[in-house]
A protein has these predicted regions:
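Short loop/turn motifs that connect adjacent beta-strands in outer-membrane beta-barrel proteins
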Residues: 20-27, 77-85, 107-115, 152-161, ...
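Outer-membrane beta-barrel initiation region
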Residues: 22-81
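Membrane-embedded beta-strand positions of outer-membrane beta-barrel proteins
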Residues: 29-33, 84-86, 114-118, 150, ...
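Transmembrane beta-strands of outer-membrane beta-barrel pores
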Residues: 35-39, 76, 88-92, 118-124, ...
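Outer-membrane pore/translocation modules
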Residues: 99-207
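Detector for outer-membrane/organellar transmembrane beta-barrel domains
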Residues: 157-163, 167, 183-254
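Outer-membrane beta-barrel "beta-signal"
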Residues: 269-275, 304-317
């Protein structure tokens, strides 16, 4: 599990209270405690080896983690059609996206939901100051930035949603010696999706997204095109979602280290499951996530495989 995800977990100091205390309150939310296992062989991941001795495919490193997730909502009106919130979105978690948000939501009478959010941890994490350094220990440095999101869900009760975001990132100690690979950047993201039901219990979501990653170095800039399909099944005592996606990343210029222009094919598969009929444990559920990502690049250095498995308990109020 990368340090971006861990930083998301660290920013969730949500306390658990009894369900009765929240029955007539404007507060609502959920909190989960998760433990799990992650594995990756990405040369760019700071959870991997500090020292690499070649610029080929990376070696596998494993990690065990214990971490919280959650969200807290406060209704601004008695009708509860306006809310401020912080935490991780259940909809995002269902498709394998972990992002801490501070935001505002408004429910229109026509079924549309407006969501405006600031995401402080999507960009902020640790990266290698020079990931291409060989034969000696690589040092980490902080990546800082800001991300802003605008989402319109279920437009006019049509099942269509539109998601847009803008983000910036700065590297504290950028030590890559090639101007073409400088990583400070601006990113623009847009995603459209459609949700439909197959029957009263099951449905699917199709989504397409585009990202323009405008970095200081042309060889670090890219355009990304992603297609995603999610299947979900809902019963009174459990919920299941399965998401698969394909993403094409096309970089803008030749990489000066490898003398070719990078191109990545990224495959993701994510399964989420929740069971909430625990005897004598009202408002509690068992949750589990399993996900894998394969990055197939035309440059061996960027090829990687990662695996994430997690199980935990969730409390909803």
């Amino acid at each position: 599990m990368n340090k971006t995800v861990l930083s998301v977990f660290a920013l969730l100091p949500i306390s658990i209270a009894s369900a009765n205390a929240f029955e007539t309150s404007r507060f609502s939310g959920e909190f989960s405690l998760n433990s799990g296992f992650s594995s990756t062989n990405s040369n760019l991941s700071t959870q991997g080896s500090e020292q690499i001795n070649h610029l080929g495919k990376g070696e596998t490193s494993d990690n065990i983690f214990v971490a919280p997730l959650g969200s807290l909502y406060y209704a601004l009106t008695e009708q509860k059609n306006q809310r401020v919130y912080l935490g991780t979105s259940r909809d995002d978690l269902a498709v394998g996206t972990l992002a801490f948000e501070l935001g505002y939501q408004y429910d229109y009478q026509n079924g549309t939901k407006l969501d405006i959010a600031y995401l402080p941890t999507v960009v902020a994490d640790e990266v290698w100051a020079n990931p291409y350094l060989t034969g000696q220990k690589r040092e980490t440095t902080d990546r800082q930035g800001n991300a802003y999101r605008l989402k319109l869900s279920n437009l006019w009760n049509s099942g269509v949603s539109l998601d847009m975001a803008y983000a910036t990132a700065e590297i504290d100690n950028e030590s890559i010696g090639y101007a073409e690979l400088q990583r400070e950047r601006e990113s623009y993201f847009i995603k459209g999706q459609y949700r439909t039901m197959l029957n009263r219990n099951a449905g699917y979501i199709t989504a397409f997204s585009y990202t323009h990653h405008d970095a200081a170095g042309d060889a670090a800039s890219f355009n990304s095109y992603k297609a995603e399909l999610s299947y979900f099944y809902l019963e009174s005592n459990y919920r299941l979602s399965l998401t698969g996606s394909y993403e094409l990343k096309e970089y803008s210029a030749e990489n000066p280290i490898f003398a070719q222009t990078r191109s990545d094919d990224v495959y993701r598969l994510f399964l989420g499951y929740e069971y909430d009929s625990i005897p004598s444990w009202d408002n509690w559920s068992i949750i589990s996530f399993v996900g894998t990502t394969i990055n197939d690049s035309n440059i061996n250095f960027y090829k990687s495989d990662s695996l994430l498995m997690s199980v935990g308990v969730n409390y909803k109020f």
